[in-house]
Amino acid sequence: EAGEDCDCGSPANPCCDAATCKLLPGAQCGEGLCCDQCSFMKKGTICRRARGDDLDDYCNGISAGCPRNPLHA
């Protein structure tokens, strides 16, 4: 939601302060296909495997989301 860095609905998230919905100091992310142990996964890590004649999607190293491969048809 607006103003929140992470989902504070789960107090078990080790990257998020459940009271403030803000990332803990040193954490880059709290969730997402390209977030691993509170850090962005390195650029080029596959975050979504291809299905059919689709292409793999890769982490970009600067966000927790899994951006769509720009070469998709």
From Swiss-Prot:
Keywords, ordered alphabetically: Cell adhesion impairing toxin, Disulfide bond, Hemostasis impairing toxin, Platelet aggregation inhibiting toxin, Secreted, Toxin
Localization per Swiss-Prot or TrEMBL: Secreted
Residue pairs linked by disulfide bridges in the UniProt entry: C6-C21, C8-C16, C15-C38, C29-C35, C34-C59, C47-C66
InterPro entries: Disintegrin_CS, Disintegrin_dom, Disintegrin_dom_sf
Disintegrin domain span: 1-73
Extent of motif Cell attachment site: 51-53
GO molecular function: toxin activity
Keyword flag Disulfide bond: yes
GO cellular component assignments: extracellular region
Tissue-level expression: Expressed by the venom gland.
Primary localisation category: secreted
Keyword Disulfide bond recorded: yes
Pfam families registered for this protein in UniProt: Disintegrin (PF00200)
Leftover remarks: The disintegrin belongs to the medium disintegrin subfamily.
Function: Inhibits fibrinogen interaction with platelets. Acts by binding to alpha-IIb/beta-3 (ITGA2B/ITGB3) on the platelet surface and inhibits aggregation induced by ADP, thrombin, platelet-activating factor and collagen.
Family of the protein in this entry: Belongs to the venom metalloproteinase (M12B) family. P-II subfamily. P-IIa sub-subfamily.
Quaternary organization: Monomer (disintegrin).
Name of the molecule in the record: Disintegrin trigramin-gamma
Species assigned in the record: Craspedocephalus gramineus (Bamboo pit viper)
